[in-house]
Amino acid sequence: MNPVIKTFQFGQSTVTLETGRIARQASGAVLVTIDDEVAVLVTVVAAKQADPGKGFFPLSVHYQEKTYAAGRIPGGFFKREGRPSEKETLTSRLIDRPIRPLFPEGFMNEVQVICTVLSTSKKTDPDIASMIGTSAALAVSGIPFNGPIGAARVGFHEETGYLLNPSYEQLKASRLDMVVAGTESAVLMVESEAEELTEDQMLGAVLFAHEEFQAVIQAIKEFAAETGRSAWDWQPPVENTALLEAIRAEFGEAISQAYTITVKQERYGRLDELREQTIARLAGDAEGQPSVAEVKEAFGLIEYRTVRQNIVDGKPRIDGRDNRTVRPLKIEVGVLPKTHGSALFTRGETQALVVATLGTARDAQVLDTLEGERKDSFMLHYNFPPFSVGECGRMGSAGRREIGHGRLARRGVQAMLPKDDSFPYTVRVVSEITESNGSSSMASVCGASLALMDAGVPMKAPVAGIAMGLVKEGEKFAVLTDILGDEDHLGDMDFKVAGTAAGVTALQMDIKIQGITEEIMEIALNQALEARLHILGQMGQVIGQSRSELSSNAPTMLSMKIDQDKIRDVIGKGGATIRAICEETKASIDIEDDGSIKIFGETREAAEAAKQRVLSITAEAEIGKIYVGKVERIVDFGAFVNILPGKDGLVHISQISDQRIEKVTDVLKEGQEVKVLVLDVDNRGRIKLSIKDVAAAEASGV
C-alpha cells in the first residue's frame, strides 16, 4: 500500500495521520503526530482464525512509553524499559474501554493493539494521540469494527469555561480533568476527576467533548477511504433459535425463579445446577446436537434476556429492590487498634476494609515519568482477593483491574485532601475488598473517606461514591441505583459517581451500546446525587468530619525554619551531624534548600528531642544571657568555653574572678562545667564571656 497522509485541525492543534510507511505487516498501522511534538505509532493485528472456545472477546491493548521519546535514558540497572508502569496500565485500559463494545457480537478473533510513544514534548499527555491512532488503525485495518471513535480531554476554569485538550500547565489551574471517547452519535467512555463540580457542569463537559471530537471522526473516515483497504469478509454466527427455544421452554421459568434468590452464592449455586441440567439434557456429540460450549452460551443468553426484560418491565430487581434504593449500609470506624485510621464499609454484599497510614515526606512514591522524576505524596491501593467472591484464584501483584479501580477511588477522594504545604505527611490508603457483589470501587471511596477522617487527616469534606446501571430495550429503559455484579454484567452501562454534598469529584462511565441520550445521562447523574447524599448522611452519623487530632499511632511532625547559612551546620561534615541526631532520637529530619525543616518522630518525645538538638545547633549566642558551658581549652590568657554546639567563647583571664589570678589552671580545669555570661559577639562571630559577672547578672534577674 502506498503511504497515505491526512492532516486536520483539532482545536488549537494540527494532527497528522500517516499509514503505509511504518509497520506495514500489521493489519493496520498509523503514525499520529500532533503539532510536530507528540508522535505515537499505533498498530493493530487480528488473528485470521476465530477462537470460539475463549468465552470472551480476546482483545488486548498495550500502551507503552519509550524514554527516548523524551530524550531520556531509563533508570535502574538494566537501562531499558521494563514492566508496564501504572500510567501505562491505566492508559491501556483507557484505550480498551471505548473500542471493546464496538467489535461486533460473535467476533472472536484475537485482536492486539499496541500504542508506542515515540516522541513527546512533555507538555501534554500522549493518551489522546494514542486513542486517535487506535481508532484510525482499526479503521484502515479492515477488521470488523463499528467505529471510528474520537477522543478528547476537557478542562474547566470558572472564567474561561471548558478547555479542549489542555496542557499539563493548564490542568494545574483547571477544576476538571476529563477524557471522553465515543462515536459520531454516542458517548462510550468518560474518565474524570473534578473539584466539586455540579452534575450540570460535568454533563456539559461530556457534551462539549463529544461535539469537539467530531472533527477527529470525520478526518478518520476520510483517511480510511483514501487507503482503499477492503473490509474483512466476516459474517456473524447465526443464532441457534431452536436451541434457545428449547432452553426457554424447559428451563426458562426456573431461570427466572433463580433470579429472585437474593443471596448471591445461593443464586449462583441454583444457576449452576440449572446450567448442568441444561447441558445434560441438550448437549451431545451426535450429529446435529449442540456442543457443551454452545449450550452454555445459549443458557447465558437466556439469563441475559430474562434479567433485562424483568427490569424494563418494572419488576423488582434481583435482590428485591426498586430502581432507586441503595442496599443496606453498615459503617464502622476505628476497627483496627494499631493502625492510624481504619473503616469497615458494608453495602449489601459488598464490603471494604480500608486502612489509612501516615508517613514522612521520605515515604512519598518516586515516579519516573516521561516528563521527569516527581514525587507522589498520596497513594490509594485496591486489593481484590479471590475469597471476596467465594472463589480460589491467583494471588500476587496487582492486576490491571485492581490498578484501575484503585485509581478511580483515588480520584474520588484526592480533591478533598489538604495541600502538602499545610499537611506535609505522605498518605497511603489501602482498600481490602473482603466481599464483592457490585461496585467495590465506590465502596473503596466511602471507606477511604472514613479511614482518612478516622486518622485525623483534615479532609475538606466527606466523600461517597455510587455505581449506577442502565438497561435499555428499544425505547424503554431503566436507570438502576447501586448495581449488583449481575446487573453490571448484564446491563448496558456502568456509571460511577463520587463526590461530596457540594459536587462531583470523580465520574467514570462505560457504555456498551449506542443510543444513550443526554436525557438518560442526566437522569443517571441526578439519581446518583440522590444516592450519594443518602450515603453521606449515613456516614455522617458515624463520623461527620475529621478527628480534631491525628491518631496517637501516627508519627508526630514538627516544622521549623532556620537561616540558610545554618543548613550546613545541621547537616555536618558528610552528613555526620544530622545522622547522629536521627540515630540518637529515632526521628527523621527533612531539610529544604530554603531552610524549612520537617521533623518526624514515632512519638512526640522523639520529635521534640530532635527539634531541641537542631535548635541548639542553630542557636546564636545572645549578649547578656547566661549559659552553662564546658571548659574546652585553657591558654595563658584565659579559657575557651563551649556554650552551644560548635560555638566556643573566650573567658579572658581578667574575666574569671574579681581577684587577681596568676595562672588560669589554678582556677579552671579542662572539662569543668561553669556558668558564663555573654559580654559581646563581634562581627566575625567571636564571643566574649565572663565568669565573674554571672553573680551580678543573676541578681539583676537575667
Curated annotation (Swiss-Prot):
EC number: 2.7.7.8
Chemical reaction(s) catalysed: RNA(n+1) + phosphate = RNA(n) + a ribonucleoside 5'-diphosphate
InterPro entries: ExoRNase_PH_dom1 (IPR001247), ExoRNase_PH_dom2 (IPR015847), ExoRNase_PH_dom2_sf (IPR036345), KH_dom (IPR004087), KH_dom_type_1 (IPR004088), KH_dom_type_1_sf (IPR036612), NA-bd_OB-fold (IPR012340), PNPase (IPR012162)
Residues the entry annotates as binding Mg(2+): 488, 494
KH domain residues: 555-614
Species for this entry: Azotobacter vinelandii (strain DJ / ATCC BAA-1303)
UniProt record similarity statement: Belongs to the polyribonucleotide nucleotidyltransferase family.
Top-rank taxon: Bacteria
Keyword Ribosomal protein: no
Name of the protein described by the UniProt record: Polyribonucleotide nucleotidyltransferase
Subcellular location: Cytoplasm
